[in-house]
Design a protein with these regions (language model features):
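Predominantly soluble domains enriched in secretory-pathway, periplasmic, or organellar proteins
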Residues: 13, 20-387
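Bacterial N-terminal signal peptides
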Residues: 5-16
């Protein structure tokens, strides 16, 4: 039965072409393994990047019905590296969370969640998976964050948060969970010890402030859900909304960085005082964020700008803006050694998706490899010695 669920397993042995390394660049010392989900054709790929370049190590198609598109949106690897979890956005009426082994892509379990499950993260102890129910196509009503007990794949609670929640990130201790509300123009903080919303923060320019509890439906920022394009819609003249798409805690948990997709900047919030400390300019349509573990760099994908911004956190200065291979930059995963950023790029039309690999020392793209259409969710697995 598990084999039927997995679909076809494909193995690709050829390495993709590698960009020439500049004077500051050097070949990787080990081999880096990354999982990426392609929403356009239901494929999950394992990317291997090493001294010889980047390649698709293996890939498989999710589901049992080749005519039914499940739409894998988010992907997250467990802290012990034994499993990865995938959200599928499509369903009748709701989507689901799937659990696979990293070693062989074997299906371990599946659980139905809310409408359009999207971004997810596994808690640092591996016990729970936090999934936002994005509800992209539904009515403008309060949606939720699902909390799934990972061992048995059981949804233990569904926490009401806001309208169109997106992004799902925990601080390093796992005590606070952060997501954003595209329709409420807000950041939401969940106390994971209580499984409830503790605070929210309004992100609209000129109106920034924090409050206790969740945002209300009445606090919507005036977006039209029917017109939302998941981060691809530019702001209209005079529009001061943030339209947040991601929240990224700093390495020490003292700050939270929020990607404002419409205002093209990143809001930095001090967690202790729950106040805004600055707005950091980025490229056009900043979408997803990743932070290095040493607390030095912030990496943002620019969905409309076909680029990636690398920002020095201390100064707020954009150190580099690096073009992506194709349009619609999406997800980003940073290697545990802070050496590389792996960026998923959706592409447009019949184009394949792409994973671009950026050297965070040389600040340049050093490799690219094609994957399935609409590559989005991406997460790091492990580093292994080069042969």
């Amino acid at each position: 039965m598990r084999t039927a669920w997995l679909g076809l397993l494909l193995v690709t042995g050829a390495y993709a072409s590698v960009a020439r390394l500049g004077a500051q660049g050097r070949a990787p010392d080990g081999e880096y393994l990354v999982f990426v989900a392609s929403e356009g054709n239901d494929r999950i790929a394992l990317i291997r990047f090493g001294p010889a370049g980047a390649k698709v190590e293996r890939d498989h198609r999710m589901g049992i019905n080749p005519t039914e598109l499940l739409g894998p949106h988010g992907i997250a690897v467990s802290p012990d590296g034994k499993y990865y979890y995938v959200t599928t956005a499509h369903g009748t009426p709701n989507g689901a969370l799937w659990k696979f082994t990293t070693a062989r892509d074997s299906l371990v379990g599946r659980v139905d969640l809310g409408a359009f499950p999207a971004t997810l993260q596994v808690s640092p102890d591996g016990a729970y998976v936090y999934v936002v129910n994005f509800n992209l196509y539904g009515d403008p009503v309060t949606s939720s964050v699902s909390v799934v007990y990972a061992d048995q794949m059981v949804e233990v609670t569904r926490i009401p948060t806001c309208v169109m929640p997106h992004g799902s990130r925990l601080n390093a201790l796992g005590t606070k969970h952060y997501s954003v509300c595209m329709m409420n123009d807000a950041l939401v903080e969940i106390d994971t010890r209580q499984f409830g919303v503790s605070r929210h923060f309004l992100l609209t320019k000129g109106k920034e402030h924090g409050m206790s509890g969740p945002p209300t439906v009445a606090a919507r920022a005036g977006h039209d859900m029917a017109a939302m394009s998941h981060g691809s819609e530019p702001p209209k003249p005079g529009d001061l909304t943030c339209s947040p798409t991601w929240a990224q805690p700093s390495a020490d948990g003292a700050k939270v960085f929020v990607a404002c997709n419409k205002s093209n900047d990143i809001v930095e919030i001090d967690v202790g005082s729950w106040t805004m400390t600055r707005r950091i300019p980025t490229g056009d349509g900043v979408y997803n964020l990743g932070a290095t573990r040493d607390g030095r760099l912030l990496v943002g994908t620019n969905k409309r700008g076909q680029s990636v911004s690398v920002i020095d956190i201390a100064s707020g200065k954009e150190l580099a803006r690096i073009s992506t291979t194709r349009k619609v930059a999406s997800g980003v995963a940073i290697s545990p050694d802070d050496r590389y950023a792996f960026v998923s790029v959706e592409g447009v039309g019949s184009q394949p998706g792409t994973v671009d690999i950026i050297d965070l020392v040389g600040l340049q793209k050093v490799a690219s490899v094609d994957v399935g259409q609409q590559a989005g969710g991406i997460d790091f697995w492990k580093i292994v010695p080069a042969p």
